[in-house]
Amino acid sequence: MDDKKNIILSLDISTSTIGVCLLLDDGSEYGQIIELTHICPKVPRKTDKHEALFMKTDIFKDEFLNKYKGYGITRCFIEAPLLSSNNSETVATLLQFNGMISLAVYNELGVVPEYISSYEARKYAFPELMGIRKYGKDERQYEYSKIKKEINDGKLVLFGSYPWTIDKKSVLQEKVAEIFPQIKWIYNKKGELVKQNFDASDAFVALLGGLNKERYGEINFSISNISEKSNGNESEISYDVHYWDKVIHRTTYVDKTIKRDTSK
């Protein structure tokens, strides 16, 4: 591998699966995928839970780091652990494992990992996923006045144009598949994508998000050119969404007859 080329590693870490992306940053918008995969480090049953983390770290080193350490990897992005669990022991275990994998990357590759939250990774990788929240958690449309106000205020949220129950990881995997149609995804016997595909695609999202934030700077969204057409009980609200040097035209269709408690 040419030492002058910028080879970047990215990891999405959980104690059961490590999503891995190895990419050649060739200056293009998305780079070239060298490897997009996952590692499921298996240890014997009844292994002490603390020792298991050390064993899994060794498996990751043997199955991936040692295999690719000669590629001249120059950077490593790691998705920062999402500390939303109510189980403090689960959070502590994830933090420990994340730190152990980070240390393995540093020791084996001589690269200091860079961390990015899942929220920032998704927002910077695919800003077009930011949208006006149209539906509540009960999947019912918000009232017209609330939606119109959020458009006027430019209040965009991640996955805002999707229903609350949307499988976010599936949306991200589909976007990665669109960018790299040559990737061979893994399916089960029912023809369904296995969940480890999502760990792999999350690793790419972390990498792309980190690169985009560095390339284009902090991202700020604004809305302009708001116009509205009514067709009976339906309102068609059109507007432009601005971020970086890009403009995306959006249209939101709203049923004006909906009445509900907007706090839900």
Where are each of the predicted segments found?
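Phosphate- and other anionic-substrate recognition elements at nucleic-acid/protein interfaces
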Residues: 1-264
